[in-house]
Amino acid sequence: MRISRGRESGPSEQRGPTFTGRVWADPVLKAEDSVGVNNVFFEPGARTHWHRHEVAQVLHVIGGQGWLQTRAGDGGPLTAGDTAHIPGGEEHWHGAAPDSYMAHLAISVGANDWLDPVSDEDYAAAFRGR
């Protein structure tokens, strides 16, 4: 067992090639035993690329509004207080709404497999008619 106190896990990092738009991650717990825990902050319109996790991912939204979408077409809005479980192997993306930031706590278990970017058309379609 280990308890991580305060900011011992490192400074905020701006994320790059596996995201569209500006995204920052704040390591909450230094990754170990294939478990990563990060606070992630998306500016309006920012999002992950399509990706999947070896075991699973849990997202808990702490502020703003966003979206979670699977490659199979399932998805929906995310708002503060929502928690989502994404099973291992399920291709998905998540990010902020076009007109709102989104912040979530991400708990990822197992390796991440980063795939292609979410097109602007697919991103816009997710929010059409919401």
Locate predicted features.
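A short hydrophobic beta-strand segment most commonly corresponding to one strand
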Residues: V58, H85, D99-P117
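Short beta-strand His + acidic residue motifs that chelate non-heme Fe in jelly-roll/DSBH
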Residues: T48-W50, L68-Q69, E91-P98
